[in-house]
């Protein structure tokens, strides 16, 4: 668990939060989730959970990167909610992140779903992906960029 947001982490997570807002009104009862992929200090893609049954934020960001000619391999993912690690309407986001070669995942908030809480981070770490969770910080901390 990390102790404080760096300036860049706050900036990228703020952008992920803004991306998450794009799903408002279309994903209930699921939460709003945003993801930004960053490589060499530059945003290469973003995604959000757009509608029920559609791509999750991480999956959309990976697709966005590839569609725009960027390889997500070696990127850092800034995700507003812990990546899911179970099959539902879509495959697990943890698998998508591993498949894409993401090197690090920064998570703003653990998933409140007891099926997922902590398991997504654990799976990523076991796969050799550096996963950082700011579980003790509140989301308003990110908004004050």
Predicted regions and their residues:
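Secretory/periplasmic and organellar redox-cofactor proteins
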Residues: 2-6
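Zn2+-dependent cytidine deaminase-like catalytic core
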Residues: 37-134
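Single conserved hydrophobic/aromatic residue that forms the stacking wall/gate
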Residues: 136-145
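Short, basic/aromatic recognition patches
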Residues: 9-26
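Conserved hydrophobic/aromatic pocket- or pore-lining residues that grip, position, or stack substrates
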Residues: 16, 34, 41
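Short, small/polar residue-rich loop motifs at catalytic or cofactor-binding pockets
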Residues: 29-32
């Amino acid at each position: 668990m990390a102790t404080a947001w760096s300036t860049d982490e706050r900036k990228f997570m703020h952008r992920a939060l803004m991306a998450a807002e794009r799903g408002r009104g279309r994903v209930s009862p699921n939460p709003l989730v945003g993801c930004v992929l960053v490589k060499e200090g530059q945003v290469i893609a973003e995604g959000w959970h757009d509608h029920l049954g559609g791509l999750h934020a991480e999956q959309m960001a990976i697709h966005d990167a590839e569609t725009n000619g960027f390889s997500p391999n070696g990127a850092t993912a800034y995700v507003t909610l812990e990546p899911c690690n179970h099959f539902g309407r879509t495959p697990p986001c943890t698998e998508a992140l591993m498949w894409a070669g993401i090197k690090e995942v920064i998570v703003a908030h653990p998933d409140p779903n007891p099926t997922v809480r902590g398991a997504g981070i654990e799976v990523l770490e076991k796969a050799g992906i550096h996963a950082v969770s700011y579980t003790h910080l509140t989301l308003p901390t990110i908004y004050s960029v």
